[in-house]
Amino acid sequence: MPTPNAPNPVSNPKARANLLQVISERSLLRDTEVMLASGASSTFYFDMKRTAFHAEGASLIAQLILDQLADLDVDYVGGLEMGAVPLVACVIQRSFPDRPLGGFFVRKQPKDHGTRRLIEGLRQEESLAGKTVVLLEDVTTTGGSVLKAVAAVREEGASVPCVITVVDRLEGAADNLKKESVELRSVLTVHDFVL
């Protein structure tokens, strides 16, 4: 049985409640059979792009992720394309000017044109070597997708102490990440929602 991953305490429970409402109204699809990235099927699905590309949703996500980062000394936030891209953008924007963070995203595979880089968003001379990175995810199930990003970032010489997800489906990600010495923090879990 997977280890339960309770949401970490946040400084603004009202923002958390508001985000729960926005996700419930915009992103939670019920009574539909979907295939998850993990390969499992589910009768509910979080289409988080509908929240991440919504003004209030993006603002709340950024605020609550920054709350989760408060106790960490972090240089960059990043994540795997596509789900993490809007999260990284809203978090780094909101981090300025108080605690400016760098940001990037990890491609699933390099393009065959352009810079052909696996990690995008860094200047040519910029490196993750020796940096501390927290990876972001919109929804986490088993952690398989974000572990690919962890491996890519570690290959560049960065440390990844933590992954922060907006919604943890509580299907084993915390245990799988722990095996790689990565803590999983969540803003919300599946138990917060009426399914």
For the regions a protein language model found, what residue spans apply to each?
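PRPP-associated nucleotide enzymes
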Residues: 1-136, 140-195
